[in-house]
From Swiss-Prot:
<dbReference type="Pfam" id="PF02984">
    <property type="entry name" value="Cyclin_C"/>
</dbReference>
<dbReference type="InterPro" id="IPR036915">
    <property type="entry name" value="Cyclin-like_sf"/>
</dbReference>
<feature type="region of interest" description="Disordered">
    <location>
        <begin position="1"/>
        <end position="40"/>
    </location>
</feature>
<feature type="region of interest" description="Disordered">
    <location>
        <begin position="82"/>
        <end position="125"/>
    </location>
</feature>
<comment type="function">
    <text>Involved in the control of the cell cycle at the G2/M (mitosis) transition.</text>
</comment>
<dbReference type="InterPro" id="IPR039361">
    <property type="entry name" value="Cyclin"/>
</dbReference>
<dbReference type="GO" id="GO:0000307">
    <property type="term" value="C:cyclin-dependent protein kinase holoenzyme complex"/>
</dbReference>
<feature type="compositionally biased region" description="Gly residues">
    <location>
        <begin position="29"/>
        <end position="39"/>
    </location>
</feature>
<dbReference type="GO" id="GO:0005737">
    <property type="term" value="C:cytoplasm"/>
</dbReference>
<dbReference type="GO" id="GO:0005634">
    <property type="term" value="C:nucleus"/>
</dbReference>
<protein>
    <recommendedName>
        <fullName>Cyclin-A1-1</fullName>
    </recommendedName>
</protein>
<dbReference type="GO" id="GO:0000082">
    <property type="term" value="P:G1/S transition of mitotic cell cycle"/>
</dbReference>
<keyword id="KW-0132">Cell division</keyword>
<keyword id="KW-0131">Cell cycle</keyword>
<dbReference type="InterPro" id="IPR013763">
    <property type="entry name" value="Cyclin-like_dom"/>
</dbReference>
<dbReference type="GO" id="GO:0051301">
    <property type="term" value="P:cell division"/>
</dbReference>
<dbReference type="InterPro" id="IPR046965">
    <property type="entry name" value="Cyclin_A/B-like"/>
</dbReference>
Length: 508
């Protein structure tokens, strides 16, 4: 009985050990893929990446093949040598990233025999061009990546190799791109296919440069320079410059004199008398060293007053000194006294007469003494012209000021707004300094809001004034700008005519 009890104990013990061993040992399937195959498939599924897709511009369905294609190709080409040097780090990134995405839903890779592995590897389709997906625009999508299968050194079956089938991922700050394989031959194939699909030619930049060089354009097509980029100088008002200019353009339409007051209002005064008065006021401004804005405002007040008030020629000089007194009080730090203006007229008018005319002018103007003049716009336009100009800065500024002051003498130029006169003065000054170069460019057209064709008539009128020469009977302005402090710009030779192609707008 004791022997039977021992036998039963041994039988039960062996059966329990066998049952425990059977419970611990994984079951092997008929195809050779058991628990080990599922574990390998699970590891492979954890490393699966986005499926490769065709990114050729034809398949993408839009966009020029030049710019976008170039950007994509450069990223793919530059990523290749980086990947070869940091394959392990890239694989770790892919494993950690893919583990957070669904991996259980992927099917295990089918097991193949050792002698079939070489044949199946050769029959695998060549890899497609790596997809470059902007991470900010598209969310990553994971799909099974079962195109590459490599043999494993175990028994009669093989599974996905750890070093051959891992879909390595690399990341850059802006783009997420997907690549397969780690051999130099695969990388070379990817680059060749990318070049073929994207149709990128090495001569594209050369052809584009040649097209730009041979493009016919009467005006220089260039980029617009940023003039208002100095935010440290409070006098430039960089943040408000554009708004100030638009306000001045609107204000000049409201505070302009009539263009025909000599024909409709004045009976005893003609344009020649007006020119003589202004020429004399230029001498007065030089005598008292008044700023140019005072002279421009004086002429503005005179023309606005003459636009609505008839006056005889004996009081025209009185009107001139009264308007200059008002302008000096507005512009100058230390304006001349009334007695000085009486003295400058050789005491032709008494103090009370000057003050009476001053009150009459202010009442007619309704005390609206702030008016945009050509000098206001010229100061802005000179700065714009000097940003990308090779001409000497002072020569351009003085020559433009000289042309603008000549415009004060001409009654017919009242038909042009002050901003147009200032832009035309810049145009003519640049032409005089460089007769063979187009005076206008994109930067001037942008900031002045005038095309070269719009300046044609005014520029030609200023050109005639400039070409009169020193023989004119109104010499004050010319003598002023023949001084050394103004770089003798009044003596600059001027071509007899301006080419018509300079007044053609740019064609892009």
């Amino acid at each position: 009985m004791s022997s039977n009890l021992a036998a039963s104990r041994r039988s039960s013990s062996s059966s329990s050990v066998a049952a425990a061993a059977a419970a611990k040992r994984p079951a092997v399937g008929e195809g050779g893929g058991g628990g080990g195959g599922k574990a390998a498939a699970g590891a492979a599924a954890a490393k699966k990446r986005v499926a490769l897709s065709n990114i050729s511009n034809v398949a993408a369905g839009g966009g020029a093949p030049g710019k976008a294609g170039n950007a994509k190709l450069n990223l793919a080409a530059s990523a290749a040598p980086v990947k070869k040097g940091s394959l392990a780090s890239g694989r770790n990134v892919g494993t950690n990233r893919a583990s957070a995405v669904k991996s259980a839903s992927a099917k295990p890779a089918p097991a193949i025999s050792r002698h079939e592995s070489a044949t199946q590897k050769e029959s695998v389709l060549p890899p497609k061009v790596p997809s470059i997906v902007p991470t900010a625009a598209l969310a990553p999508v994971t799909v099974p990546c079962s195109s590459f299968v490599s043999p494993m050194h175990s028994g009669d079956s093989v599974s996905v190799d750890e070093t051959m089938s891992t879909c390595d991922s690399m990341k850059s700050p802006e783009f997420e791109y997907i690549d397969n394989g780690d051999s130099s031959s695969v990388l070379g194939s990817l680059q060749r296919r990318a070049n073929e699909n994207l149709r990128i030619s090495e001569d594209r930049d050369v052809e584009e440069t040649k097209w730009k060089k041979d493009a016919p354009s009467p005006m220089e097509i260039d980029q617009i320079c940023d003039v208002d980029n100095n935010y440290e100088d409070p006098q430039l008002c960089a943040t408000l410059a554009s708004d100030i200019y638009m306000h001045l353009r609107e204000a000049e339409t409201r505070k302009r004199p009539s263009t025909d007051f000599m024909e409709t209002i004045q009976k005893d005064v003609n344009p020649s008398m007006r020119a003589i008065l202004i020429d004399w006021l230029v001498e007065v401004a030089e005598e008292y060293r008044l700023v140019p804005d005072t002279l421009y405002l004086t002429v503005n007040y005179i023309d606005r007053y003459l636009s609505g008030n008839e006056i005889n020629r004996q009081r025209l000089q009185l009107l001139g000194v009264a308007c200059m007194l008002i302008a000096a009080k507005y512009e100058e730090i230390c304006a001349p006294q009334v007695e000085e203006f009486c003295y400058i007229t050789d005491n032709t008018y008494f103090r009370d007469e000057v003050l009476e005319m001053e009150a009459s002018v202010l009442n007619y103007l309704k005390f609206e003494v702030t008016a945009p003049t050509a000098k206001c716009f010229l100061r802005r336009f000179v700065r714009v012209a000097q940003v990308s100009d090779e001409d000497p800065a002072l020569h351009l500024e003085f020559l433009a000021n000289y042309v603008a002051e000549l415009s004060l003498l001409e009654y017919n130029l009242l038909s042009y707004p002050p901003s147009l006169v200032a832009a035309s003065a810049i145009f003519l000054a640049k032409f005089i300094l460089q007769p063979t170069k187009h005076p206008w460019n994109s930067t001037l057209a942008h900031y002045t809001q005038y095309k070269s064709s719009e300046l044609s008539d005014c520029v030609k009128a200023l050109h005639r004034l400039f070409s009169v020469g020193p023989g004119s009977n109104l010499p004050a302005i010319r003598e002023k700008y023949t001084q050394h402090k103004y770089k003798f710009v009044a003596k600059k030779p001027c071509p007899p005519s301006i080419p018509t192609e300079f007044f053609r707008d740019a064609t892009c």
